[in-house]
Amino acid sequence: MVKNTEDKPLAQNKKARHDYEIYETFEAGIVLTGTEIKSVRQAKIQLKDGFARVRNGEVWLSNVHIAPFEQGNIFNVEELRTRKLLLNKKEIAKIDKELSGTGITFIPLKVYLKNGFAKVLMGLARGKKDYDKRETLKRKEQNRDIARQIKAYNR
């Protein structure tokens, strides 16, 4: 019996939500070779420095490290190669228009399997300033303290 791996994240870019303000997300397919998908299924993928660009009406994902498959020998490809993302034409046009603005980037947030296919959750993001990051952390900690106090009060 096959395990249900529906939308189970294989890799997440946790630092992205800290460093960027994400205002829109897109689900994209990713073109991988046979040994790459085997490595992805083993969760040997890092999204930390990844980003995407639109070139000639196609979206290309760069700087995403997929470790070589151990039993792949000659079929393994370069770990940091540029990979094509599969999106609709309307989505690509929208992304291209947004990326032409200043300070906007297109980053990978999560990789997961959906119906046996590898999907990448991509986000249009704007970089946060240091004071925004501190404010977010402060707000998070305050919410945690309030939740802790409510829990202690209800005991």
Swiss-Prot record:
Gene3D superfamilies given in the database record: 2.40.280.10
Entry annotated with the keyword GTP-binding: no
Task: Write one Gene Ontology MF term.
Answer: RNA binding
Instruction: Tell me the leader sequence span.
Output: none
Regions crossing the membrane: none
* PROSITE patterns found in the cross-reference section: SSRP
In the UniProt record, which is one GO cellular component term?
A: cytosol
Cellular localization per UniProt: Cytoplasm
- A GO BP entry: trans-translation
The reply to whether Nuclease figures as a keyword in the UniProt entry is no
Top-rank taxon of the source lineage equals Bacteria
Predominant location category? cytoplasm
Keyword entries, A-Z: Cytoplasm, RNA-binding
Record function comment: Required for rescue of stalled ribosomes mediated by trans-translation. Binds to transfer-messenger RNA (tmRNA), required for stable association of tmRNA with ribosomes. tmRNA and SmpB together mimic tRNA shape, replacing the anticodon stem-loop with SmpB. tmRNA is encoded by the ssrA gene; the 2 termini fold to resemble tRNA(Ala) and it encodes a 'tag peptide', a short internal open reading frame. During trans-translation Ala-aminoacylated tmRNA acts like a tRNA, entering the A-site of stalled ribosomes, displacing the stalled mRNA.
The family this protein is said to belong to: Belongs to the SmpB family.
The molecule here is called SsrA-binding protein
Q: Which species is this UniProt entry from?
A: Lactococcus lactis subsp. lactis (strain IL1403)
Recall the taxonomic lineage recorded for the source organism.
Answer: Bacteria, Bacillati, Bacillota, Bacilli, Lactobacillales
